[in-house]
């Protein structure tokens, strides 16, 4: 196993950080890696907002539901779908009309590009010995976050990433069996997939039991049900439209 794959497969979310700052050279390398990642049509539909100001990080922590590691770690990156640059290129610099943000494709493209960027930043940071944890809860209060970071129209906050020096490395969390994720030639039949999920539920229950000293035995199915039994961010469409993503087509 080469060093790149070794680093990738050793990933774990870190929720406890020292107060040691992240060097600017390291941040520059992480962002350079992000910019080198692929994007749809080379449109580069991602903007990264780097936040290091303590008061601003504290506010983001509150908006994300009270996640102290955002406030504790020295760096927070916000990944945004960004069609503002495209709007400038098409309508301000040239005589074109931007239509893409009137359809769902713009949301899909922006989300995919932002996901690639976040994954790349995670891999780059961890290759430098830093710890990370992604923050999806930035979508919980998007209006306040948009105002706090002065995001213009056609820009939407999708996910965040905490970066810092780990104070404690948590145990590596088990993943679904590879057969459940990597299907050969055609999609796996439902019976086999169900069997893999059942086995994984047992593994996750054992992991949680050990991690919490017997206080919790919640499995994977129960964990995702706590989110997917409801529309936990029901205002997303409204906020997308307010930011210029009409999602009509």
From Swiss-Prot:
CDD domains: NfsA-like. One of its GO terms (molecular function) is FMN reductase [NAD(P)H] activity. The keyword Oxidoreductase applies. One of its GO terms (biological process) is response to toxic substance. Its EC number is 1.5.1.39. It comes from the Bacteria. Pfam families: Nitroreductase. Belongs to the flavin oxidoreductase frp family. Reduces FMNH(2) to FMN, with NADH or NADPH as reductant. It also reduces nitroaromatic compounds, quinones, chromates and azo dyes. It could supply the reduced form of FMN to luciferase-like protein and contribute to the degradation of aromatic compounds. Homodimer. This is FMN reductase [NAD(P)H].
């Amino acid at each position: 196993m080469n060093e790149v794959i070794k680093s990738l497969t050793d990933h774990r979310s870190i929720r406890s950080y020292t107060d040691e700052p992240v060097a600017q050279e390291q941040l520059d390398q992480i962002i350079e890696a992000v910019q080198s990642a692929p994007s749809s049509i080379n449109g580069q539909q991602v903007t990264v907002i780097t936040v290091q100001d303590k008061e601003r990080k504290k506010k983001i922590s509150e908006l994300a539901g009270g996640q102290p590691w955002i406030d504790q770690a020295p760096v927070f990156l916000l990944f945004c779908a960004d069609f503002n640059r495209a709007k400038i290129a098409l309508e301000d610099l040239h005589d074109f009309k931007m239509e893409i943000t009137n359809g769902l494709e713009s949301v899909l493209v922006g989300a995919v590009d932002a996901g690639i960027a976040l994954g790349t930043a995670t891999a780059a940071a961890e290759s430098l010995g830093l710890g990370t944890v992604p923050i999806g809860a930035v979508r919980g209060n998007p209006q306040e976050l948009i105002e706090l970071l002065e995001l213009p129209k056609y820009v939407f906050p999708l996910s965040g990433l905490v970066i810092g020096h780990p104070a404690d490395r948590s145990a590596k969390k088990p993943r679904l069996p590879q057969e459940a994720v990597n299907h050969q030639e055609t999609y796996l039949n439902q019976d086999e997939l169900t069997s893999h999920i059942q086995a994984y539920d047992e593994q996750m229950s054992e992991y949680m039991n050990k991690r919490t000293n017997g206080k919790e035995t919640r499995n994977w199915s129960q964990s995702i049900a706590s989110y997917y039994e409801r529309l936990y961010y029901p205002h997303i469409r409204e906020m997308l439209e307010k930011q210029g993503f009409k999602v009509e087509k």
